[in-house]
Amino acid sequence: AAVEARFPDPPVNYRTPAFEPGRTGLTSNVELQALLRGLARPGVATGGAVVKLLSLGASQSGVPVEALLLTRSVQADPDALRRDGRPTVLLIGQQHGDEPAGAEALIVLAQELVQGALRPLLERINVVILPRANPDGAQGDRRVTASGVDANRDHLLLNTPEAQAQAQLAREYRPLVVVDAHEYTVNGPYVQKFGAVQGVDAMLQYAMTANLSEFVTKAAEEWFRQPVLAS
């Protein structure tokens, strides 16, 4: 009871399957497909935004891998978006199937961009949302894809259809910013290595590979991390 008292229910309501009253499970693949199709359905009130369902093939088990494009450009094809001049932001969730928070958060974000408080953002940017990059892993609550490959380690060889789908989005929409949402355990490596738990609930980190362009690192720090912290 003492621990529960420290974590009261937040004063917000999210309209996703996982947060339905009495629900104990997360949003299923079938529910996610229906939700994305519903947001992209003709006739949905979007305040002038174009919402397009992007079909990116299927997972190794045959589950559709789908994303949403949200824009105020009249034409929603990649070439037209580049001519329009608005930068594109790509948001990716649940590359690791046992890290579901990213997918659930991106569902809410998509809803807010289409019909909620975040609609004004589309005046300035295009947004592509891939809420569940690894549907097979999500279905089985496993980190890896159906073949046992970690899709988050497959962005060079592109052996898996899940990594190929992300590469397709990057290639076609040329995002200025890519946000890849993950989770980390509380009782994990930090306890084993340091005998302590991490003191933060969220971490924001940009790529730090050795051969990365100095300009990209500088841009990530000055155009992304610092503005996020300042906000």
Language-model features: locations:
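M14 metallocarboxypeptidase catalytic domain recognition
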Residues: 1-231
